[in-house]
Every structure is written in structure tokens, then in C-alpha cells.
């Protein structure tokens, strides 16, 4: 006889809410980072331009992992533009040309904010789903590393 392993549905509740919020925050982060990437001006342009692409790639990959985890648990990930705009925990990025120093500071705050939002859910998520908790810990750790690198660039 083969044992069947099932995963409890996460269409509502703590795990689903944590994953959905992480999804919209990570999606907003990668969209804002790409917008800044196109519009930064000033000394240090090239290194920040390249680093923003790293943030874009990392946040996009993390958002995909989060969405796929939510779907695997029976949820329906919602990464639509309207949902991201309405529920993201990030402040909007201003339009137009952006000064390099302001973008370093702004994205240090943004990456730290997304990490903090994820970390705030970890105890509750861990009580229900260790695997999701592990996924979120890895994402938060990477975001904290990026925030540190951005802050260090301002020193």
C-alpha cells in the first residue's frame, strides 16, 4: 500500500494571508526597482543600475516561488496590478528622474520593509506549515542582505 501525502488547503488563514502579502510586496518591489533602474541619474549610476537589476531578478524569482507555494497549497495567488496597487505595504515610487543617493536610501528602506513584513508572519506560519516558513525565511534573509548592501553603499 502506498501512503498518500496531502497538504492542507491554505485558501484562507494565516499561511495564505502571509503568502499573498509577500507576493504583492515582492511584486511591487521588483516593479519599483525596474522603474528606478530606468530613471536613476547621477554619480554612481552604473553600479546602482546593475544592483537594481539584481533586486528585480531576486524579487521576481521570490514572488514566483511564493505564488507557486500558495497555489500548491490550494490557494489562488493574486498578482494582478490592481491587487498589488491596493495591498502592497510599500510606499509608491515617485516618477521622473531619480537621484542615485535617494534610490540607494529608498531601496534600503523598501527591501528592509518587505523583509520585516515577512518576518512578522514567521511564528504564525511556522505553527501551521514548516515548509512555507522555511521558504519565507530564505526570502527575508536575502532581502535583509540586499538592504545591508544598499545601506553600506551610502556610507
Q: Could you say what each language-model-derived stretch is?
A:
Residues 41, 47-83, 153:
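Conserved alpha-helical segments that form or flank metal/cofactor-binding pockets of metalloenzymes
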Amino acid at each position: 500500500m502506498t501512503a498518500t501525502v496531502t497538504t492542507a488547503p491554505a485558501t484562507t488563514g494565516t499561511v495564505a494571508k502571509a503568502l499573498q502579502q509577500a507576493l504583492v510586496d515582492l511584486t511591487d518591489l521588483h516593479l519599483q526597482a525596474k522603474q528606478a533602474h530606468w530613471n536613476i541619474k547621477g554619480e554612481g549610476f552604473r553600479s546602482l543600475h546593475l544592483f537594481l537589476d539584481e533586486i528585480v531578478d531576486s524579487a521576481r524569482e521570490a514572488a514566483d516561488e511564493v505564488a507557486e507555494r500558495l497555489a500548491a497549497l490550494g490557494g489562488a495567488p493574486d498578482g494582478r496590478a490592481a491587487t498589488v496597487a491596493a495591498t502592497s505595504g510599500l510606499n509608491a515610487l515617485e516618477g521622473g528622474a531619480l537621484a542615485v543617493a535617494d534610490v540607494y536610501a529608498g531601496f534600503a528602506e523598501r527591501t528592509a520593509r518587505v523583509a520585516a513584513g515577512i518576518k512578522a508572519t514567521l511564528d504564525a506560519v511556522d505553527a501551521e506549515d514548516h515548509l512555507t516558513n522555511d521558504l519565507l525565511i530564505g526570502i527575508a534573509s536575502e532581502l535583509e542582505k540586499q538592504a545591508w548592501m544598499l545601506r553600506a553603499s551610502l556610507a
